[in-house]
Amino acid sequence: SDNQVTVIGHATGDELHSIHFCSILKALSDEGVIHASDSTITISGATTATLFFVNETSFSGSDKHPVSQGADYLANAADDAWHLVNFSYDALRNRHISDYVELFGRFRLRLGKPVFDNKRPTNQQLLEYTDNKGGNPYLETLYAQYGRYLLISCSRTKGVPANLQGLWTPHLYSPWRGNYTVNINLEENYWPACPSNLPEMTMPLDDFIASLAANGKHTARNYYGIERGWCSSHNSDIWAMTNPV
């Protein structure tokens, strides 16, 4: 359309067996002229504009084929975009803040008498923290809350816990492939969850472990001759892989 760009594609590999996606970017403004081509949106003569972005994939669970059993990502993306533009920027922002604050505001941490320091950037404080071998309660408190922020942002999708990369990546091939290293890193991601009053964030992890258990029964039997119980190797992925790497 005149104010929308749509990108449809799939992950690398055989398109008959890959996750497919649909991304839609839509622009709205009460003034000026909006024009969209195949790959760009141009807004002319406007002082303000709102950009709406939605993305849907065919992934529908670790036990579902992403094509033959995949989610209707095209219809879902179109439906998301259609509903999204019925909300103003302020309404969406307020809805987001309300959702986030309800979770983030449950926990407070005080370590001695941390002093808020907005004059030195965080990266400088990190370097000084390393050089001084600690001694910055403000930075320690900030990092504890930062970990909670990451968990709130990354652990909201059923069956898909926070991975080693996080929610966003600029890379086609994410570091660590965006997978799960289950010998310590996955556990570390979730250490703050219950102690800092975010038990809901563990639900995707619980679902993922259930998928590991289902697949791990076959790995235990086929690799190790174990007929009862299940196992997981040190790496897994969105498909709940349990075989040795």
Protein language model features and the residues they cover:
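Aromatic-residue-lined binding/catalytic grooves and analogous aromatic/hydrophobic interfacial grooves
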Residues: 1-245
